Amino acid sequence: MMQRKIKSYVLRAGRISNRQQQGLDLWLEDYELKFDSPTPWNFAKEFGRHDADTIVEIGFGMGTSLFAMAMNNPQCNYLGIEVHKAGVGSLVADLHEYQISNVRVVVHDAVEVLQTKIPENSLAGVQIFFPDPWHKKRHHKRRLIQSEFIQMLVKKIRPSGFIHCATDWEDYAEHILNVLSSESALFNQQKEGGYSPRPDSRPLTKFELRGERLGHGVWDLVFIKK
């Protein structure tokens, strides 16, 4: 089992809007999966339906992409993992407003969630969009995407399932590509290797659109479990 003691995130006290606080206070209980439940989650039970693919998004931020993907793919289950309360409140408020029923959230460290709550071979895919690049070299050990972490993810994903990462930090993109390419249980969706075009399934965020206008690059990587 992976034993990760170095956190890939820092919890800071940030401002929470009235709407985000409403989401946390009034509607989070409708969507939250509790980490302290005694056994791994049964997704058929938690989502109230059988035979639906379950996709995990790690670090969903303000929930923009997760919300759009859930709305566009009602046949899929989405589980979002996030530790920052403002983003959780924002997503939950949107889910409530639009009555989206195919999303669940867990407010906890993603590594611990994956270690203890996600059954093996239960996921259709995992998506990690714009993780903290920890760009200073002395902080690289804090990067979420490391070989040991990917080895754990592979166990949770079923055969033919995917890992989809996106980053706007080229050095981190190169690191992710090396890590994923080194995992023997995965193959690159790009037959010639390297990065993938942005899949239509990943929505463009306002942040990304602004970056494109400024000439910033974004690198997508999609690997499939053999």
Curated annotation (Swiss-Prot):
Instruction: Recall the GO molecular function terms of this protein's record.
Output: tRNA (guanine(46)-N7)-methyltransferase activity
Which keywords has UniProt assigned to this entry? Methyltransferase, S-adenosyl-L-methionine, Transferase, tRNA processing
Binding annotation for substrate? 136, 168, 205-208
The organism's superkingdom is given as Bacteria
Q: Which reaction does it catalyse?
A: guanosine(46) in tRNA + S-adenosyl-L-methionine = N(7)-methylguanosine(46) in tRNA + S-adenosyl-L-homocysteine
Any Gene Ontology CC annotation: tRNA methyltransferase complex
**UniProt KW tRNA processing keyword:** yes
InterPro entries tied to this protein: SAM-dependent_MTases_sf (IPR029063), tRNA_(Gua-N-7)_MeTrfase_Trmb (IPR003358), tRNA_methyltr_TrmB_bact (IPR055361)
State which pathway it belongs to.
Answer: tRNA modification; N(7)-methylguanine-tRNA biosynthesis
Q: Which amino acid positions bind S-adenosyl-L-methionine, per UniProt? A: 57, 82, 109, 132
Does the keyword Nucleotide-binding feature in the UniProt annotation? no
Q: Which residues form the active site?
A: 132
Tell me its EC number(s), please: 2.1.1.33
| Cross-referenced PANTHER family | 3-DEOXY-D-MANNO-OCTULOSONIC-ACID TRANSFERASE/TRNA GUANINE-N 7 - -METHYLTRANSFERASE, PENTACOTRIPEPTIDE-REPEAT REGION OF PRORP DOMAIN-CONTAINING PROTEIN
Q: What does this protein do?
A: Catalyzes the formation of N(7)-methylguanine at position 46 (m7G46) in tRNA.
The UniProt entry's sequence similarity note says:
Belongs to the class I-like SAM-binding methyltransferase superfamily. TrmB family.
Q: Which NCBIfam families match?
A: tRNA (guanosine(46)-N7)-methyltransferase TrmB
Q: What is this protein called?
A: tRNA (guanine-N(7)-)-methyltransferase
